[in-house]
Regions:
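Mid/C-terminal beta-alpha module of Rossmann-like enzyme folds, strongest
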Residues: 176-233, 237, 241-259
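N-terminal Rossmann NAD(P)H-binding glycine-rich loop of SDR-like oxidoreductase domains
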Residues: 1-23
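Glycine-/Pro-rich loop/turn segments that contact NAD(P) or position catalytic residues
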Residues: 69, 76-140
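Conserved beta-loop-beta element that borders a ligand/cofactor-binding pocket
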Residues: 115-165, 188-191
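Active-site regions of enzymes building and remodeling cell-envelope glycoconjugates
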Residues: 21-31, 39-45, 59-63, 97-102, ...
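NAD(P)H-binding glycine-rich loop region in Rossmannoid oxidoreductase-like domains
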Residues: 26-98
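Short, solvent-exposed loop/turn segments at secondary-structure junctions
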Residues: 10-12, 47-53, 89-92, 128, ...
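A conserved structural motif in NAD(P)-dependent oxidoreductases
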Residues: 168-174
Length: 259
């Protein structure tokens, strides 16, 4: 088993990954049947939850649920010596880490499907490295509040953001390097979580022309994400629980970096 496969190759993360590393098989929704009976030395599986971004999918979960079911059915017929699985961190509590019990809320079809797919992949294949992401920047697919703010049309309308909601903005350009480092370190579950920034901090420092369009803080505003990683020191020297500090996150999103 020496062939390699990237499952989810046509989404933003998959296109980026395949531009950095060679795969024998590039698999997406159009050719999933190629997986039947295949054996791979290595496979990268990108969860359908990260193909558009969780916010968009939650607005219409039916296609996502169908994708999960189809993927599980096909993966029953696949063998792989080593699997890298990229999935949503929504299955962890808002302040959780890799050791936190997963949220198994059966009444929430989105979370239930995420947990079902993660559990299946880890039981099906022998060596699996799980990566958890929340917001991803630089995809061009609106998968983070930063990308959405960058695309806001001119006007005076109030921004559709929660002022103090916490966002963990992971830059896509780090992904391949961070994954390979985890394999080198022998880690098998990693939260790729930078220090959170609020919508207010993000707009103030990276999109100052939008400051006057910010809403006021409301009691009903969501908390957001403040997950940490018990392995953060493998990526960032200070033992903060984050793989990047807030200053580096904001610097990478500054107007001159985006132009």
């Amino acid at each position: 088993m020496t062939d390699t496969a990237l499952i989810g190759s046509s989404c933003a993360l998959g296109v980026f990954w395949s531009s950095k590393r060679y795969f024998d098989y590039l698999i997406d929704e159009t050719n999933l049947s190629l997986l039947r009976g295949k054996e791979f030395g290595q496979a990268v599986i990108i969860c359908p939850s990260l193909r558009e971004g969780g916010t968009a999918i939650r607005g219409n979960t039916a296609p996502f649920l169908a994708q999960v079911k189809t993927l599980i059915d096909l993966l029953h017929e696949v063998k792989a010596e080593r699997v890298t699985y990229i999935t949503s961190i929504d299955t962890q509590p808002e302040t959780g880490n890799e050791l936190s019990p997963l949220l198994r809320e059966t009444e929430d079809e989105w979370l239930a499907a995420l947990v079902e797919l993660k559990d299946f992949i880890n039981l099906r294949f022998g060596r699996v490295l799980d990566f958890y992401l929340r917001w991803v920047t630089g995809t061009g697919a609106g998968m983070s509040v930063a990308d959405l703010l960058a695309a806001v049309p001119e006007g005076t309308e109030e921004l559709d953001v929660a002022l103090l909601e916490r966002h963990q903005l992971y830059p896509m350009h780090r992904l391949v390097r961070d994954v390979e480092k985890a394999w080198e370190c022998g880690i098998f579950s990693v939260n790729l979580v930078p220090e959170p920034v609020t919508a207010f901090e993000l707009v103030e420092q990276c999109f100052p022309s939008l400051v006057n369009r910010l809403p006021v803080a409301k009691e009903t505003d969501p908390y957001g994400s403040a997950r940490t990683s018990v392995y953060s020191t493998q990526y960032h020297d200070p033992d903060t629980g984050y793989i990047m500090d807030k200053q580096d996150v904001l610097a990478g999103l500054s107007p001159d970096k985006q132009s």
